[in-house]
Amino acid sequence: MGAGPVIPTRLATVRRRRPWRGVLLTLAAVAVVASIGTYLTAPRPGGAMAPASTSSTGGHALATLLGNHGVEVVVADSIADVEAAARPDSLLLVAQTQYLVDNALLDRLAKAPGDLLLVAPTSRTRTALTPQLRIAAASPFNSQPNCTLREANRAGSVQWGPSDTYQATGDLVLTSCYGGALVRFRAEGRTITVVGSSNFMTNGGLLPAGNAALAMNLAGNRPRLVWYAPDHIEGEMSSPSSLSDLIPENVHWTIWQLWLVVLLVALWKGRRIGPLVAEELPVVIRASETVEGRGRLYRSRRARDRAADALRTATLQRLRPRLGVGAGAPAPAVVTTIAQRSKADPPFVAYHLFGPAPATDNDLLQLARALDDIERQVTHS
C-alpha cells in the first residue's frame, strides 16, 4: 500500500518537465535558424565592383541578376585567369583599372579574345586598350541616351553620377550615348564598349530607374561574361599583402585577450598596493609658451595693471645688473642712472618704469615698446 502513490507522483513530475523541455527545444531551434540566417545575410567584404562584394560599391547584385538571366559569370582574379577564361564568344568586363600599372600585363589583357567592356578606365588603361579614344571636353551632362545603341535605348534615362566622357581620335566610327559617357566602336574584329562611371553598376546604384537595365544590357549581351575587377596591383610592382596579413586571425584575438589579462592583473595589484601617490616632478616649459599663456590670461581678465607690473619688473631685473644698481635702490636713483646711460629724458624713463597702469590695451602695447627701447639703449650704450 505504501508504494502505490509513488507512481502517479513520478508521472506528474515528468508531465511538469515536458513543457520546459519543449520550450528549450524551441529556443534552440530559433537560435540555430537565426544563426544560419545571420551567416547567409552577412555582408561579404570585397573591393569596389567585386562580384562577390555586397557593399554599396560592390557588384554582387549585378552578378546575381546576370546569373539569374542565364549569363555565365566567370570571376577572374588575375590576368592569367582572364586569358584562361576569355573566348571569342565571351565579353570581358574590366573595372578597378587603377591597379593595372604594368604595361606588359596590359598588353596581355589587350590580346584577350572576345568583346571588351571597360568601366571607368584610367588614362594608362585607356591608352593601352583603347588608343582610339580620348577624354572629351567638359560639356552639359545628358541622362538620356540620344543615340542609336539598342542597349541604351532600352534602358532609357540613367543616373550616372560623376563620369568621364569620351570622343574619338581620327576617323574612328564611334557610337556615343549619354553625352559621351557611354561609347562603343569596332576595332580589331571585336566590339569595345567604354563607360565613364561604375556607379550605375554597383549594388548601391542599381535602384534608380534605367540603371539596372543599362548595366544588364551592357554586361549581359554575351552568353559568357569574364569579370575582372582587381583589388591589388598585379605584376612586378605587386605588393598585395603585408606582414600582418600573414598572421593568423586567431593570433589577433589571443593578443587582445592577453592585453585584457594584463589590465585585470594591473587593476588587481593596484588595489592591493593602494592608491597612487602624487609626486611633484620638474616640468620643462618653453618660455614663449609661458609668456603667451600669461598674456592671454591677463587679456581675458583685463588685468592691464598686472601685465604692466610684470613688464616693468622684468625690465628692471635685467637692467639693474648692467647698471650696477642694487635691488633696494630707490626709484629716483634708478631713473637717473638709466637716463644717463640711455641718453633719455628722465621723466620719460620714470613714467614708463614707475608710472601708473595703462588704461587701454593700446597703452599697454605702447608701454611694452617703450620698455623695450629703454632696455635696448642701455644695452648698446
From Swiss-Prot:
Entry's Gene Ontology cellular component terms: plasma membrane
Keyword set, alphabetical order: Cell membrane, Membrane, Transmembrane, Transmembrane helix
Membrane topology, from the record: Multi-pass membrane protein
Compartment list: Cell membrane
The keyword Membrane belongs to this UniProt entry's keyword annotation: yes
Transmembrane segments: 22-42, 246-266
Descriptive protein name: Uncharacterized membrane protein Rv3691
Organism encoding this protein: Mycobacterium tuberculosis (strain ATCC 25618 / H37Rv)
